[in-house]
Amino acid sequence: MSVQHWLDQWGIQLPANNAETCRLQVADDPELVLEKVPGGWLMAMRLGRLPSPMLLGVQLQLLQANGPFSALAPVHVAADSAGDLVLWVEVQEGHVDVPTLNNWYAKLCQGHKHFSPLLEAVPDQPRPASGARLFV
């Protein structure tokens, strides 16, 4: 099954010029970037700039998203060369069917909805110092 079969459900066509990267907008969802990789495509959604400072809880959630037991798996979080965080999943042509691609797309959207608000810059405010950090 190809990515084009998946896009057919929305009446979207991949560029005919054999572009390496294309940006798509499906309904009101965040922009989806498709980038050609050997043997398939990378589906990605930009989350935004890596904020500084970032709350420790947000850092831990981002790290957990890459774990094998994450609700978003097989979607991953990474930073691109511009310093933006992106959600991504690799699609191997001929190895994934349309329902699976729909599921992965839903996970990209779910991750975007969850993480985008958390990545807004945190005001630099003094925080009380403690001798230990406790996690509950």
Model-derived features with residue positions:
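Short, highly charged C-terminal tails/helix-capping segments
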Residues: 119-136
